[in-house]
Amino acid sequence: MTSAEIREAFLRYFETQGHTRVASSSLVPANDPTLLFTNAGMNQFKDCFLGLEKRDYVRATTSQKCVRAGGKHNDLDNVGYTARHHTFFEMLGNFSFGDYFKRDALKFAWEFLTSEQWLALPKDKLYVTVYHTDDEAYDIWNKEIGLAPERIIRIGDNKGEKYASDNFWAMGDTGPCGPCSEIFFDHGEHIWGGLPGSPEEDGDRFIEIWNNVFMQFNRTADGVLHPLPAPSVDTGMGLERISAVLQHVNSNYDIDLFQHLLKAAANIIGIEDEGQPSLRVVADHARSCCFLIADGVNPSNEGRGYVLRRIIRRAVRHGNKLGATGTFFYKMLQPLIEVMGQAYPELEARREVIEATLIREEEQFAKTLEQGLKLLEGELAQLKDKTIPGATVFKLYDTYGFPTDLTADIARERGFIIDEAGFEVEMAAQRQRARDAGKFAVDYNNIVKVEGETQFDGYTNTTGQGQIVAIYKDGVQVDEVSEGDEALIVLNQTPFYAESGGQIGDTGIFKNETGIFEVQDTKKSGGAFVHQGIVTVGNLKTSQNVEAIVKADIREATARNHSATHLLHAALRQILGSHVQQKGSLVASDILRFDFANDQPVSFEQLQQVERLVNAEIIANTAVTTELLDIETAKAKGAMMLFGEKYGDEVRVLSMGSVIDEKNFSIELCGGIHVKRTGDIGLFKITSEGGVAAGVRRIEAVTGTKALEVVQKADHDIQHINSLLKAQKDQTVERVQANVELVSALQKQIEQLNQKLANFQAADLIDQVQTIAGRQTLITTVQGVDAKALRNLHDSVKSKLENAVIVLAGVEGDKVSLLASVASQYTANLKAGDIIKHLATELGGKGGGKPDLAQGGAPLNEKFGQVMAALPAWLEQK
């Protein structure tokens, strides 16, 4: 069976067992700030397991895209060198949300693996493990399925504390947890390795292929396990591992899917040996990079984007080691589509964006390598011994993406070594930062635990009645809050919109006969709407009814900006192209911010075109309509869907703008608050455009009265400029241009005069040359010159003293500019950078540079004269 056939067989089997086939979620976790990447099949069902979300089904099956290349789960450094480590993999899974439990889960797994109708694995090749106290699972395997006792292995707490075991799973220190049962396949005696729990368990003979997790308990802070009223099941089987078993190979890289990618990589690079670790790196990383970009991740210097950039650069580096030249990595997308495109159509749909992103990153990495080489050469020139400091190696690696093995190779060629211990210290600190970044944010779900969902009735209302179902103060659930208390309050129904899709949460008040609560923000926790604020009058208690009143003016302004964001998105796609995809947004009452994929800055002319398009739709004053559709109908209608967003089976489709070919100007999935007609937006005005990351641009804009204020301020500024220039309104540009040209001409004259002055000063300074340590040396202080004038003076002196040491200090106001140069025949023993560092350190400033030329600066203080006077003696020692 091929990998694709195995994937389909798994999903089809569980469909026959009453499971709903659910599409893989994005690699960017939806609504989970604690997770860097989706790394398990259960991630998209987390709220179901926590009881925070109800779905139309209680049984599900998926083939989930997963990435493990950052934070807690990081396989990056092992990829290419082992048989089973990957940055990207597929996790086949079946899930029960309070429906079936251990008996059915284990029987399903056994039937699928061993039945002649399905995978038909030899039963004598399979072993299982259970948690050492899980007699229920043991008996199911032994008495009901018929597995011999010698094939059932009990695993205890083997990780240093109670319930810390390979066979006990926990979502965290507290919360859902339970035992698990793993299924292992025996690859045969010809491969080294022992059974689970044995000293040789890390070998490759017995390989785990399926893990059945039984969420049976809730662990409280005191460590006590309490049985869950409706236990659940979470299982996972790696597609690559089971494919290796069924295709009778011992390495995942030998399965059909990887063989196709390895052959393609070898052909692209131009080599014949397909077994090299570096080729495996290229093949593996092509999968993670292409899927991450398809799911909306862009290379950057932080968070998810930083991990993606590291993976791309690692792949390119390994390709270069094999002899690849030019941009090559993007060519791996086509063979990937050939083997995975049918299961994951987003690869083809995002082909243009994926290829453009990979090409840009390869080209940028080439420039980075060039910059890194220059930096390394500069560091080598200034070293006093033969060891490159670990901090320097880390700076090259972390800031410039310069591979450490390349640094070591270059150092070795020049007779240097790298400080590996120092580098590891820096790396340890970096790994801690990565772990901290992997936490991202506090998980709101850890504070708010509410059964059921808040009913939202705010699409057409800004007031409503609701009952208080939960109150939280200082992270603890309470029954009552009083005046001055900051709290989180959950209602059974609310007109307050909770922050989502870039739109900020509503503000306003709750009130009843006992108190008033000022709502400062509204957020979601699972299905609950959480109102954050402070009690301003009296007190409020659980079960009380309150009148909920949203600030209507803020809501209306926010709605204008949200609808304008949709029109902006559609206009950008018309003007710039269909590659434009939303990467992020902020919709507040006073501003809208829209981040989108685009390689180039948007020109002023293009921005004007966008403004005209959006305002034309506003003037048309068409109705804004919403309808609830199933996801497939919404797709057929052409609704824009955001990569990384989590959509249910039924979605809210928002349409607005003029209709062309039976399609509205803008059609998007959106759960936010919007205007009733486009004319309600009033006016749209872009205020800024710029870059926020590689391949991502940001537009900020305002609407309504805010837009009018911007236009009127621009008119006021032009009027003020005209009055200063004594110009008529139609003469503004002409007069400004004339003044710019005049200023430019005067600046050139000033520069020419400064150069003449520098030449005169240089002639006078030659008389101050002295001999120090056998070298012609000029040390002088010049008053009233800044750094630029000091450079002009230096160049004039240098033209008259070619083989000398020159140290100049320019004093202007309360600042000192420093400049030093050393003739090339002296740099072996005396470096300009050392001179400047010495002076800057003594004066409390900063500076440095190359051996032959360096600059710095410092505040002017009482030590200045003394430090300059002592410099000849310091130079005498060099």
From Swiss-Prot:
Protein name: Alanine--tRNA ligase
Cofactor binding note of this UniProt entry: Binds 1 zinc ion per subunit.
GO molecular function: alanine-tRNA ligase activity; aminoacyl-tRNA deacylase activity; ATP binding; tRNA binding; zinc ion binding
Role description: Catalyzes the attachment of alanine to tRNA(Ala) in a two-step reaction: alanine is first activated by ATP to form Ala-AMP and then transferred to the acceptor end of tRNA(Ala). Also edits incorrectly charged Ser-tRNA(Ala) and Gly-tRNA(Ala) via its editing domain.
Organism from which the protein derives: Acinetobacter baumannii (strain ATCC 17978 / DSM 105126 / CIP 53.77 / LMG 1025 / NCDC KC755 / 5377)
Cofactor(s) of this protein: Zn(2+)
Any one Gene Ontology cellular component term annotated for this protein: cytosol
Protein family membership: Belongs to the class-II aminoacyl-tRNA synthetase family.
Subcellular location: Cytoplasm
PANTHER family in the cross-refs: ALANINE--TRNA LIGASE, CYTOPLASMIC, ALANYL-TRNA SYNTHETASE
Reactions catalysed: tRNA(Ala) + L-alanine + ATP = L-alanyl-tRNA(Ala) + AMP + diphosphate
Pfam families per the UniProt record, alphabetical: DHHA1, tRNA-synt_2c, tRNA_SAD
Enzyme Commission numbers on file: 6.1.1.7
Binding site for Zn(2+): 562, 566, 670, 674
Taxon lineage: Bacteria, Pseudomonadati, Pseudomonadota, Gammaproteobacteria, Moraxellales
